[in-house]
Amino acid sequence: MIIGITGGIGSGKTTLSNLLRSNGYPVYDTDKEARRLQNEDDKLIAETKALFGENIYVNGELDRKTVASIVFSQPELLTQLSSIVHPVVKNDIIQWASSFTSNKLIFIESAVLFEGGFDVFTDKIILVTASEEIRIARVIKRDGMTKEQIIARIKNQIPDAVKAQKSDLVINTDQGLPENTLQSIIIWQH
């Protein structure tokens, strides 16, 4: 069974994923793997350079800060970037998931689970939520981003209210991850 984990920036997705990993559950992090693929997949590198120019790679690494500053101020470029990255990530998910037996419980973490079409791989979906104020405070502390940068990212994601309608379980992390979260997920998924 494959369970999707989604939620906006700063909602607590990664905290939940880390809890699952520490308890032996495999978690595919689409953001982390997209970063890896953008530096390793030759076709994706070529398409990214075609979109942003040769100088978008510095010492063989994608300049993610520059890309972020461009795409979050120009939504059409975010759409174009997503259209070249998401298919490569989907293929990578297929390869990753095929390495597990069908009775193994595995997870896919993605802020853009629905936007990227990664939800097609899932049997159930968990939405991790928190108030916008808490999310902003968490991301400022974690990443040092400005409030304006965070709000720009939030505006480019499907609202939690819409995601909740498409999700099977909603976990609110305003007070942190609930103590019995892991046990609740194990019981719920059966």
Task: Go through each PLM region and give its residues.
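ATP-dependent NMP and nucleoside kinases share a basic, alpha-helical "lid"
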Residues: 92-100, 105-141
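Hydrophobic anchor at the beta1->P-loop junction of P-loop NTPases
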Residues: 3-5
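ATP-binding Walker
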Residues: 11
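Small-molecule kinase domains that catalyze NTP-dependent phosphoryl transfer to phosphate-bearing small molecules
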Residues: 93, 120-121, 132, 141, ...
